[in-house]
C-alpha cells in the first residue's frame, strides 16, 4: 500500500484529501481496463475515461459561471500534484494524458480570448478534445527566442507557416497551441499562440523518417 501520510500535511485541505481518496479508489478498476498495445489509442481512451470521471476538470479553470468547465476557480497546483502522483503510480500513460490536457490548453487557460476559452476548454475538461503544445522546432528546439514558425494576419485569422517537432499528442490532438512569430520584436518578443484545429487545409501531422517523432507542419489558416 502507498504511504498516504502526506494527506495530513497542513497545506492540504479537506478538498485535497477527498480528491486523493476518490482518485485512489477509481484508478485500479478504471485504468486496468485500458488496452496499451497501441499507445495512441490508449492515450485517446485515457483522455475519454479521465474526462468522463471528472478528473480533467482539474486541468482547466472554472471561468465565469463555470463556463470553461473547470472544477475550481483557478487551476490548483496541489490538486494537480495529487492527480499526477496518483495517476503515475498506477499508469504512467494516464499521468501523461492528464498532464498534456493541461499543458496543451494552458496558453488558452492563461491568456486566451473568451471565445477561445469557451470553444476549447469545456471539451478538454470533458475529455472530448485532445490538446497539444506545439513549441519545439527542428532547428530551434525549445528556444522560444529562435522560433522560425510565422503567423501572418489574414482577415479575421492567421496563416501559419512553419514546422514543429517533438510534439506530444502530435497526430491525435484535436487542436494545437502553436507558438509562432507574429511581430518584428527581437527574441522571445512578438510571439503569439494561434490554436488551429485538426484536419484544416494545409495542416499536416506525422512522424519523422525514423517513425517516432511527432511532427506538425505546413501552411494553415487559424
Residue ranges and their predicted role:
Residues 143-161:
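Cytochrome P450 C-terminal beta-domain/meander region
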Residues 1-19, 151:
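Intrinsic disorder at enzyme termini
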Residues 97, 139-142, 166-169, 182-185, ...:
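Short Gly/Pro-enriched turn/cap motifs at secondary-structure boundaries
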Residues 127-135:
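A short, Trp-centered hydrophobic/proline-enriched beta-strand micro-motif
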Residues 157, 161-206:
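A short core secondary-structure module
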Residues 53-118, 122-128, 169-175:
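Internal helix-loop-helix
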Residues 16, 83, 113, 133, ...:
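Buried hydrophobic positions in well-ordered alpha/beta secondary-structure cores of metabolic enzymes
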Residues 146, 201-222:
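Flexible, small-/acidic-enriched active-site or ligand-binding loops
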Amino acid at each position: 500500500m502507498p504511504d498516504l501520510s502526506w494527506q495530513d500535511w497542513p497545506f492540504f485541505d479537506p478538498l485535497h484529501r477527498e480528491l486523493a481518496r476518490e482518485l485512489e479508489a477509481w484508478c485500479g478498476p478504471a485504468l486496468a481496463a485500458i488496452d496499451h498495445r497501441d499507445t495512441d489509442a490508449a492515450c485517446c481512451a485515457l483522455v475519454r475515461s479521465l474526462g468522463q470521471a471528472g478528473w480533467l476538470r482539474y486541468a482547466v479553470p472554472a471561468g465565469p459561471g463555470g463556463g470553461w468547465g473547470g472544477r475550481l476557480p483557478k487551476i490548483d497546483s496541489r490538486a494537480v500534484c495529487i492527480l499526477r502522483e496518483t495517476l503515475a503510480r498506477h499508469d504512467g500513460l494516464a499521468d501523461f494524458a492528464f498532464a498534456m490536457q493541461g499543458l496543451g490548453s494552458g496558453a488558452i487557460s492563461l491568456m486566451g480570448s473568451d471565445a477561445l476559452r469557451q470553444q476549447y476548454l469545456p471539451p478538454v475538461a470533458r475529455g472530448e478534445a485532445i490538446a497539444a503544445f506545439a513549441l519545439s522546432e527542428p532547428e530551434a528546439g525549445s528556444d522560444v527566442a529562435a522560433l522560425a514558425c510565422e503567423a501572418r494576419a489574414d482577415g479575421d485569422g492567421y496563416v501559419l507557416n512553419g514546422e514543429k517537432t517533438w510534439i506530444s499528442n502530435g497526430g491525435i490532438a484535436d487542436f494545437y497551441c502553436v507558438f509562432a512569430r507574429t511581430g518584428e520584436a527581437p527574441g522571445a518578443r512578438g510571439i503569439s499562440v494561434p490554436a488551429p484545429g485538426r484536419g484544416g487545409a494545409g495542416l499536416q501531422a506525422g512522424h519523422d523518417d525514423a517513425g517516432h517523432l511527432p511532427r506538425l507542419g505546413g501552411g494553415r489558416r487559424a
